[in-house]
Amino acid sequence: MFSWIKGKEGEDKAVEYLRNSGYRILERNFRSRFGEIDIIAEDNGTIVIVEVRSKGSTGYGYPEESIDHKKVRKIIKTAQFYLLKRDIKGKQVRFDIISIVNNNIFHIKNAFDLDY
């Protein structure tokens, strides 16, 4: 349960950061049979799919290093399902990672794409 609470705190910080950066939050914790997307936002007409990872330190690596190929594929499939379900067409889609270490936020834009 502790990791779930920490994860939610990280996602809350990421949402606050994105809003302060001018993003419009469309969805949080969108789930499908393919997986889950932490945050779906819009930035100047681009749909932004955001995976949030947070840690207390980098002693065992950076948070974003825990996102493996399998997780990326799940995020992409879930994003494709989301776009289809919401009938979103003709918009650019970007995949970002927000990495949080000790309250420091690192925003990695275009972390991967549909061809990953």
Swiss-Prot record:
Xref: InterPro entries: Restrct_endonuc-II-like, tRNA_endonuc-like_dom_sf, UPF0102_YraN-like
SUPFAM superfamilies assigned to the protein according to its UniProt record, in alphabetical order: Restriction endonuclease-like (SSF52980)
Paired cysteines (S-S): none
Molecular function terms from GO: nucleic acid binding
Coiled coil ranges: none
Similarity field: Belongs to the UPF0102 family.
Record protein name field: UPF0102 protein PERMA_0362
